[in-house]
Amino acid sequence: MRYSRLFGKTQREIPSDAETISHQLLLRSGMIAQLTAGVYSFMPLAWRSIQKIETIIRQEMNKAGCQELAMPVLQPVEIWQQSGREAPFGQTLFHLKDRKDRNLVLGPTHEEVITDLASRYIQSYRDLPQRLYQIQAKFRDEPRPRGGLIRVREFIMKDMYSFDASPEGLDDSYQTMKQAYESVYRRCGLESMVIDADSGAIGGKASHEFMIVAESGEDSIIYCPKCSYAANAEKAVFKKKTLSKETLKDLEEVATPGQKAISDVARFLAVKPENTLKAVFYMADGKFVMAVIRGDLDINEVKLKNLLKCNDLRLAEDGEVKAAGVVAGSASPVGLKNILIVADDSVENGSNFVAGANKDGFHLKNVNCGRDFRADKMADIALAAEGSACPFCDGTFASKRGVEVGHIFKLGTFLSERFGANFTDAEGVSHPIIMGCYGMGVGRLLAAAIEQNHDEKGIIWPMPIAPYQVYICGLFLDNPVVRESAEKIYKELEAKSIEVLFDDRELTAGVKFNDADLLGIPLRLTISPRNLDKGGVEFKLRRNKESELVPLDSIVERVIATIKSESDL
């Protein structure tokens, strides 16, 4: 491809609304163009990389015994009502009506459609197992699209669905997909982590996320350096500090003028934060909830939402807190009625806590769960953090940031039961099909690759997913010798099926080098009068600072060998 014919332009300025590195570099390199919030066009360079990623995905899916199909984007809302997932997805669903006033949604995922297909075409154990996948656009009305391709409203996704006759069959499908996903990321030249994850609105009994480690990632990865445990912070469990049990003392009300934050109250009363209880107020599907937790811990809102089995959870506003009769800054569950109290299990680990007196400017000493208040629900609703104790060894948690690029779920039978997707076993007994689902964000993977592979000058593409393998930088192309040499190398490489972007523009060396670094093509060949006078071509890998002069008569062989070594991942 001649750069002079390439559709798209680079830009020097960093767009003001681009926060993540991948968003900045994708826009600056002219690889994507925004149409509206969370909706992008893939320009030719980016689309070449997308196609390479999809090819790797297809190869690994097919190797794992999957069959590709294509399902409709338009879905009748009735199948979402049948599955019971219309409410959990809520406003994320794009709703529309056709000319006959029928309600439809744009598919955010395809569990409903594939389960409907399974109910029609799988009748016997002889029809199992099945593994079906597609690569297709999905639509989700994200409230705050951000990060370029990281969180968008229209995106490309590979979704695969497994159908098995037994839990052991599901385990096999799950492990096969786990290995296939790891192969995809490895072949794309990326470092990934597999972590425990929350199933969210998709549902299911177990799930894992695949993370590309990157400093600007939107997800927090909690892991133990001493053992193999790793999880999304939303899911992570940890060993909470054990407090000594004391003889229960009588409640005592004390004045705490102006002390509202836990840290201030603890300091004022000369106690440690873990010897206090704090209350956080939420609205769960419109119902007021008080969440109570030990003062040294924070609420994990995902765990809380799962415990409450609600579709919408948010912090209560000031007016809602007042309407509930709660005094912010001095609140506790002691003496409260007609309010749903949810407590973290840490409140049972300790005694004689300091908590709010439900009276402005006052707190209670010697508050004890069971004696002074009872929780309507009690479970682990605490957020793990760096420094938390690992529950599986004596290690201490560390944390990384990451970009989620894949999520796999053991769905079980809850969808097949709702859609009547059953099979008959060898004895003629009917059973619901056991399902798994496996998603991979293709556009996210592209962005994550940049998050993990860049420097201050631009992108550094891994060879397997680079839009082009070689960047020929011709300098002083008005010189006939340079022009002839550049054209000759370009044609010889293309004849060997090497993917080449030939910068044939009449621009300065500085502009060309800057664009080469920004675009991040893995291998750059610089052809100039000075290099030709020395009998060679400047050969440079994008990820290296050093370059070398390679003789003209061996440059093609050197390029081929380098591409092979860089692609063998």
Swiss-Prot record:
Subcellular location: Cytoplasm
Gene3D superfamilies registered for this protein in UniProt: Anticodon-binding domain, Bira Bifunctional Protein, Domain 2
EC numbers for this chain: 6.1.1.15
Signal peptide (from-to): none
Catalytically driven reaction(s): tRNA(Pro) + L-proline + ATP = L-prolyl-tRNA(Pro) + AMP + diphosphate
Function, in words: Catalyzes the attachment of proline to tRNA(Pro) in a two-step reaction: proline is first activated by ATP to form Pro-AMP and then transferred to the acceptor end of tRNA(Pro). As ProRS can inadvertently accommodate and process non-cognate amino acids such as alanine and cysteine, to avoid such errors it has two additional distinct editing activities against alanine. One activity is designated as 'pretransfer' editing and involves the tRNA(Pro)-independent hydrolysis of activated Ala-AMP.
Quaternary organization: Homodimer.
Protein family according to the UniProt entry: Belongs to the class-II aminoacyl-tRNA synthetase family. ProS type 1 subfamily.
Protein name: Proline--tRNA ligase
Organism: Dehalococcoides mccartyi (strain ATCC BAA-2100 / JCM 16839 / KCTC 5957 / BAV1)
